[in-house]
């Protein structure tokens, strides 16, 4: 990180009041820290727009393991892109539903494609993907 620089920001009073309430709810010690986090998130999002970015993420899938051929299809697709999958965790939520959590890393475009492919398999009830750039200059 570089040297901290002060700068001024002009805001509408109503917007500032809403921002202060947001900072309080989220437990920020100062407006500056909240603003730093928001800037980092915007930069991370911008980097992830690039198909060449390096990224890491978590993919969560909920599915009924009794759905015909679904477990096999999920495993086959994971093996097709084994080099992007670092780890998996399989949890039995109830008699029917399973939660599969995958830790993924690699090219941002490639892991987004993997997440989309797994989430779109027929029988997957819910899929959620969250990923972050691993470029050093974001942080």
Swiss-Prot record:
Pfam families: NikR_C, RHH_1. SUPFAM superfamilies: ACT-like, Ribbon-helix-helix. Transmembrane segments: none annotated. CDD domains: RHH_NikR_HicB-like. GO terms for molecular function: DNA binding; DNA-binding transcription factor activity; nickel cation binding. Ni(2+) binds at residues 79, 90, 92, 98. Binds 1 nickel ion per subunit. The keyword Transcription regulation applies. One of its GO terms (biological process) is response to nickel cation. Its cofactor is Ni(2+). Keywords: DNA-binding, Metal-binding, Nickel, Transcription, Transcription regulation. HAMAP family: NikR. Transcriptional regulator. Belongs to the transcriptional regulatory CopG/NikR family. This is Putative nickel-responsive regulator.
């Amino acid at each position: 990180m570089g040297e901290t620089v002060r700068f001024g920001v002009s805001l509408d009073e109503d917007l500032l009041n809403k921002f202060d309430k947001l900072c309080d709810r989220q437990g920020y010690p100062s407006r500056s820290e909240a603003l730093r986090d928001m800037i980092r998130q915007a930069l991370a999002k911008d980097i992830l727009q690039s198909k060449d970015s390096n990224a890491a993420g978590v993919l969560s899938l909920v599915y009924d393991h009794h759905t015909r051929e679904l477990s096999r299809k999920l495993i086959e697709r994971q093996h097709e892109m084994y080099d992007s999958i670092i780890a998996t965790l399989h949890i039995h939520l109830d008699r029917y539903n399973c939660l599969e959590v995958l830790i993924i890393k690699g090219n941002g475009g490639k892991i987004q494609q993997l997440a989309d492919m797994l989430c779109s398999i027929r029988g997957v009830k819910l899929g959620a993907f969250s990923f972050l750039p691993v470029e050093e200059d974001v942080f």
